[in-house]
């Protein structure tokens, strides 16, 4: 149906500011008002007003200009003529007024009818809104509106005719604007009444015209709105039918899915691909659902709401689509999890690495943990790894940290079967798994894939049977303990490659070259930050064993500075310079070189007899004395500090991890003969170490060393070991530095300090970095002892205060349960449980306090033991000295390496590691100083056993 187009009113209603015969109407109205009935008086002659109209008679000028007294009585004929004219004019005026009133009355009634009709139709049009959100109802509304528009259109000619009549009337009878003075006056003249009628007609015509224009415009807008709504509803209805059909088809496919447990493992990749294709095939459904929802939203904005049936259908489509999405996502996740857990690259095959009652479980971040169903406990470590750590405790009797660490790592290496893996094989696996980027972060699944490929390649190359699940699980456990003790499930690729490279069965030089290449740039150069990252990763290996304190601690900045001394002032270091530094076996990396020597020495037999245990032949390391002839010691006796009565480890010793040659025997004989003519004082003045020492200091927080993984919420065993070892090393270095200058290793309580001071490899050609002349005891003993005394006094005060505080807390904890029990009897029954719970908490607190007291007591005993040894040292009388007057106390040196199979070039002689037999003679001034210090010690510690008594009393209570 074509929209109805109404034409506007073809006239413009006049505002009527003109009045063409104003004077005429003015005089006639005034005449009507003053002379409603004409009367003639002989005595008074009233001049008639002049008339402007044509043919109107005028009075004689003489009558106008003359006075009444001067004019004589009018003639009868003239009076009659004037009177007749007045009557005629009055009659015409009355006729005109009656005609005007009749004409305006005929216009007012139709205009009012039109106004009422238009108002009624406007209300009917408003009643048609809002539209219903249903196609049938909107179509019905469309037909109704079409009939409505036809009715309005048919009324148009009549309305136009009435408005044209009103226009014609107003053009004949214009009016002026209504003034306030006229509107307030009660008496209206005929002219004013005519203007009021004209004004009223004009108002009615204006209202009718505006209502007509408004109605026609609303009809057109309503027609467009209905058409637009019907179009959207038809589109929504068609889209919902199509979506419903598509969803029904998809739900049918979903119903055919088999349970995950019924699928074959080999078919999992096919099912995963099928689910992905299914998801892509039904991806257009998402766009269709979005389109339908958008159309419904647009209709709602237009105040058109879907019917109950359509709303329910749309809601069902949305619900079905969401359910289908969830089903597809869950199905895909289940298939992927099953493929990951049971597929070729999954952790499912690792479940065979444990035996009953153990079970291997996986945390949400894919980190494995182990459940003991018999003990109902869980732990991070593999049961075999726990057993391995327990066996490592047997090596704690080794006095030298580097050898103790190397021996432990050797056991770990053999348990993980990494001693059979070559670095070349490991590099191939790294390249296959795209691990070239050292900053790449690996998750547990990636680590498992790499380890699995590594051990499978080992089986192929060596032709040996390897328990791949056990080796993979154990290696993963060890890597997580070293580089991810917090079990975050992430580790850097550099960490992974460093761990594998350190324990693989390859020459140490190749390992170091490879590790340097991982942090070097394209020009084979490395800056301090990247070198620090490498050393940080490497130091994590001994840290996990609790041995990091002997290698400079976790802070690698001193080692970085030591290495960059070889860079000749450049900001980067080259590979050759790095290897030159590492060949000196720096303190932070000496354990790696010792591990290599331990590996080589395992299968070596020396055809000689141990001078202490009489073992023959000597297996492993062989230690030859360079002070006494024909004195050889096996590795067990030397590393554990055993010595016979006449063969204490007081003299320079040479270490061999390969069979000796005749040239080496001759060289050692010459060295021994030379040392026979050297005094003990010579060895005290020329100590040499078995490795390059690194000055460990507290660094600022701005170190660029990478942060390690976060710790677990509970106390980590290895971290606690590291913490205690670091603290012990720090205390010993501060408190007992002078003990190591005067006591033999057999009498020293800390073998790590012995290693740190006397095991640095230093060559004769590198004196600048290794040889540090010891300070004379005669010149610095007083200052050192005073510092130690002040430190011990502070420690003693702190411990005494802590013991007093713990004693007070302990007494409160003992009294609190008694008070709680007494009050429980007096209180109501409902408070018994609360009091008992409080008592249990207090007992637990008491246990914690007792444990802490025990720790403090042990620490106090250590300090008192050191104090007692200090007193004995100060009170010890001078012993018989040699020709030079030196004391008899001496220090044993750590082993020297043989040159047979060492990475150093053939022909270069490794220096002897020697130690002094005595500290030196004490002068009379030093004796006086020691006596003075002894007095201070007596005043500072009046009773050595006082703290023991206090602690025992607390523990007994």
Swiss-Prot record:
Subcellular location: Postsynaptic density; Cell projection, Dendrite; Perikaryon; Cell membrane
Gene3D superfamilies: 1.20.58.60, 2.20.70.10, 3.30.60.90, EF-hand
Biased composition (Low complexity): 877-894
InterPro entries reported for this sequence: Dystrophin-related_2 (IPR017433), EF-hand-dom_pair (IPR011992), EF-hand_dom_typ1 (IPR015153), EF-hand_dom_typ2 (IPR015154), KCMF1/Dystrophin (IPR050774), Spectrin/alpha-actinin (IPR018159), Spectrin_repeat (IPR002017), WW_dom (IPR001202)
Membrane topology: Peripheral membrane protein
Any one GO cellular component localisation term in the record: plasma membrane
Phosphoserine, modified sites: 748
Intervals holding Spectrin repeats: 102-179, 231-337
GO BP: central nervous system development; synapse organization; synaptic signaling
ZnF (ZZ-type) ranges: 605-661
Keyword terms, alphabetized: Cell membrane, Cell projection, Membrane, Metal-binding, Phosphoprotein, Repeat, Synapse, Zinc, Zinc-finger
Annotated GO MF terms: zinc ion binding
Tissues expressing this chain: Detected in trigeminal nerve Schwann cells. Detected in brain cortex and hippocampus. Detected in brain membrane fractions and highly enriched in the postsynaptic density (at protein level).
Chain ranges of the WW domain: 358-383
Binding site for Zn(2+): 610, 613, 634, 637
Annotated region described as Disordered, given as residue ranges: 877-923
Organism domain of life: Eukaryota
UniProt modified residues of type Phosphothreonine: 910
SMART domains found in the cross-reference section: SPEC, WW, ZnF_ZZ
Keyword set includes Cell membrane: yes
Function: Required for normal myelination and for normal organization of the cytoplasm and the formation of Cajal bands in myelinating Schwann cells. Required for normal PRX location at appositions between the abaxonal surface of the myelin sheath and the Schwann cell plasma membrane. Possibly involved in membrane-cytoskeleton interactions of the central nervous system.
UniProt subunit comment: Interacts with PRX; this enhances phosphorylation. Identified in a dystroglycan complex that contains at least PRX, DRP2, UTRN, DMD and DAG1.
Name of protein: Dystrophin-related protein 2
Source organism (scientific name): Rattus norvegicus (Rat)
């Amino acid at each position: 149906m074509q929209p109805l187009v109404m034409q506007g009113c073809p006239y413009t209603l006049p505002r009527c500011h003109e009045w063409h015969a104003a004077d005429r109407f003015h005089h006639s109205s005034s005449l009507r008002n003053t002379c409603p009935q004409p009367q003639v008086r002989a005595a008074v002659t009233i001049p008639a007003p002049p008339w402007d109209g044509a043919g109107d008679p005028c009075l004689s000028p003489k009558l106008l200009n003359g006075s009444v007294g001067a004019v004589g009585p009018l003639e009868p004929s003239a009076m009659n003529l004037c009177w007749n004219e007045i009557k005629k004019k009055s009659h015409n005026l009355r006729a005109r007024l009656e005609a005007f009133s009749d004409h305006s009355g005929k216009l007012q009634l139709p205009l009012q009818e039109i106004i009422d009709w238009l108002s009624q139709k406007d209300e009917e049009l408003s009643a048609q809104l809002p539209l219903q959100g249903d196609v049938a109802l909107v179509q019905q509304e469309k037909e109704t509106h079409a009939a409505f528009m036809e009715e309005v259109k048919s009324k148009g000619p009549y309305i136009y005719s009435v408005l044209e009549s009103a226009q014609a009337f107003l053009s004949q009878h214009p009016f002026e604007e209504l003034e306030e003075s006229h509107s307030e006056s009660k008496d209206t003249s005929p002219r004013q009444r005519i203007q009021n009628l004209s004004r009223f007609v004009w108002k009615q015509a204006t209202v009718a015209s505006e209502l007509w224009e408004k109605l026609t415009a609303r009809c057109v807008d309503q027609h467009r709105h209905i058409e637009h709504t019907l179009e959207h509803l038809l589109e929504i209805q068609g889209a919902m039918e199509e979506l419903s059909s598509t969803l029904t088809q998809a739900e049918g496919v979903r119903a055919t899915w088999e349970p995950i447990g019924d699928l074959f493992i080999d078919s999992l990749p096919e099912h995963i691909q099928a689910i992905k294709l299914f998801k892509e095939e039904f991806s257009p459904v998402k766009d269709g659902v979005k389109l339908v929802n958008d159309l419904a939203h647009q209709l709602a904005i237009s105040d058109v709401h879907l019917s109950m049936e359509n709303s329910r259908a749309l809601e069902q489509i949305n619900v079905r689509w969401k359910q289908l999405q969830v089903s597809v996502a869950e199905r895909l996740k289940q298939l992927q999890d099953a493929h990951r857990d049971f597929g070729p690259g999954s952790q499912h095959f690792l479940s065979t690495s444990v035996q009953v009652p153990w079970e291997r479980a996986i945390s949400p971040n894919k980190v494995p943990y182990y459940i003991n169903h018999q003990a109902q406990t869980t732990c991070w470590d593999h049961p075999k790894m726990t057993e391995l750590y327990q066996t490592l405790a047997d090596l704690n009797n080794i006095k030298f940290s580097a050898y103790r660490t190397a021996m432990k790592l050797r056991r770990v290496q053999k348990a993980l079967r990494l001693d059979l893996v070559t670095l070349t094989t490991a590099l191939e696996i790294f390249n296959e798994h795209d691990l070239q980027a050292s900053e790449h972060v690996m998750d547990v699944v990636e680590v498992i894939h790499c380890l699995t490929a590594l051990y499978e390649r080992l089986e192929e190359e060596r032709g040996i049977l390897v328990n791949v699940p056990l080796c993979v699980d154990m290696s993963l456990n060890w890597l997580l303990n070293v580089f991810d003790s917090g079990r975050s499930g992430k580790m850097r690729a550099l960490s992974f490659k460093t761990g594998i490279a350190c324990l693989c069965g390859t020459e140490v030089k190749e390992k170091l070259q490879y590790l340097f290449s991982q942090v070097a740039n394209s020009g084979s150069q490395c800056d301090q930050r990247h070198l620090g990252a490498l050393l940080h990763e490497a130091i994590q290996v001994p840290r996990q064993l609790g041995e990091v304190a002997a290698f400079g601690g976790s802070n690698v900045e001193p080692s970085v500075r030591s290495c960059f001394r070889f860079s000749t002032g450049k900001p980067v270091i080259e590979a050759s310079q790095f290897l030159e530094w590492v060949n000196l076996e720096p303190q932070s990396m000496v354990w790696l070189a010792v591990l290599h020597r331990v590996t080589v020495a395992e299968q070596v037999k020396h055809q000689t007899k141990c001078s202490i245990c009489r073992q023959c032949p000597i297996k492993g390391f062989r230690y030859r004395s360079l002070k006494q002839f024909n004195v050889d010691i096996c590795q067990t006796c030397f590393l554990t500090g055993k010595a016979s009565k006449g063969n204490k480890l007081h003299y320079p010793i040479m270490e061999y991890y390969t069979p000796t040659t005749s040239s080496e025997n001759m060289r050692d004989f010459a060295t021994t003969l030379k040392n026979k003519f050297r005094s003990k004082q010579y060895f005290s003045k020329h100590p040499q170490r078995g490795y390059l020492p690194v000055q460990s200091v507290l660094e600022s927080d701005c170190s660029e060393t990478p942060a390690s993984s976060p710790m677990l919420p509970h106390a980590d065993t290895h971290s606690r070991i590291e913490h205690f070892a670091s603290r012990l090393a720090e205390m010993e270095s501060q408190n007992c530095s002078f003990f190591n200058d005067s006591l033999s290793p057999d009498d020293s309580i800390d073998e790590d300090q012995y290693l740190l001071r006397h095991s640095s490899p230093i060559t004769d050609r590198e004196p600048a970095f290794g040889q540090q002349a010891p300070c004379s005891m005669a010149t610095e003993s007083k200052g050192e002892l005073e510092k130690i005394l002040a430190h011990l006094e502070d420690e003693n005060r702190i411990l005494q205060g802590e013991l007093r505080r713990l004693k007070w807390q302990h007494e409160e904890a003992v009294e609190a349960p008694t008070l709680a029990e007494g009050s429980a009897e007096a209180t109501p029954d409902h408070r018994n449980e609360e009091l008992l719970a409080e008592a249990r908490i207090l007992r637990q607190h008491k246990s914690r306090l007792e444990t802490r007291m025990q720790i403090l007591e042990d620490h106090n005993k250590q300090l008192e033991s050191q104090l007692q040894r200090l007193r004995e040292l100060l009170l010890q009388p001078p012993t018989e000295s040699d020709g030079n007057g030196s004391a008899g106390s001496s220090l044993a040196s750590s082993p020297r390496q043989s040159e047979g199979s060492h990475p150093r070039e053939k022909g270069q002689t490794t220096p002897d590691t020697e130690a002094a037999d005595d500290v030196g003679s004490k002068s009379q001034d030093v004796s006086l100083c020691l006596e003075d210090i002894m007095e201070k010690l007596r005043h500072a510690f009046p009773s050595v056993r006082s703290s023991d008594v206090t602690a025992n009393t607390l523990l007994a209570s």
